Amino acid sequence: MCIRDSATLYASDNARANLILSNPFCILRTVGSGGKINYERYFAPEELDGIYTPVHCPDSVGTAPLEGRNVVVFVMESMSAEHSAHLHPELYADRQVKGYTPFLDSLMQAGYCFERMYANGTRSIQALPAVLGSIPSFKTPFVLMPQALAPTRQLPRILRDKGYATAFFCGSAAGSMGFGAYARSAGIERLYSREDYEARHGRDDFDGYWGIWDEPFLQYAGEEMSALPEPFFAALFTLSSHHPFVVPDAYRDLLPEGLTRNHKCVAYTDNAFRRFFARYAGEEWFRRTVFVFVADHV
């Protein structure tokens, strides 16, 4: 992991992160490393603006007043439309198991479901910039590029400027995959990781590979969300449907096997969401919250 991604964990803004990185170690580490990006210019900026511009400015017609609802974004590890019988009923027409996401399928039918929403990233490290900042994937993951410390206007920062509390949850170790560092640079104030979970609930729920099992970590996240000042924005990255595709012993015989090893893990995470909703649906903050579910990559 590039050291600049960790610097933002210890700085209140990206400018101070750059100051942290202005030290002899970083100079020696990067001498001769290259990495310069050649910006080819095939058109003059004015000419290109006349052909196409990626800049879109909001107008009053398409802008609704901010209602101050809480927003929770679940970024789901290795999730795919093919796991859902609601999205792909033809895959399960002649099979005993009707998909591996029955709870998420029920939410799709009760809420808004976007059936043609595609990721152009292939790794978890590319997910948060895309989901929280609308930043596309490049050959080099954005969080490893020098541009990651450039000023950006991303959803958490926009909402924080509107008075929202902001939080990010991931059951992996603090600093893993640059998630926490990126979340901090995107404007998120509160970070919750494996260490925070274990400080309260002990170490029995570590999966032995990546972090805390999804079910107990989602329950913990709900506890922390209940204590956040409203309105709040929270993003949560799940883990349990990642390779090597294991589930807790208590669920080994309770979940469908599927055609591949990850299907049982997907079913486990789906059940973890079901239990999260069952526990917190009666809370006042829950009824004032918009929940968004999105996969991390293709």
Predicted regions and their residues:
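Soluble catalytic regions of membrane-associated enzymes that act on cell-envelope
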Residues: 6-298
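Conserved small/polar residues in nucleotide/adenosyl-binding loops
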Residues: 1-5
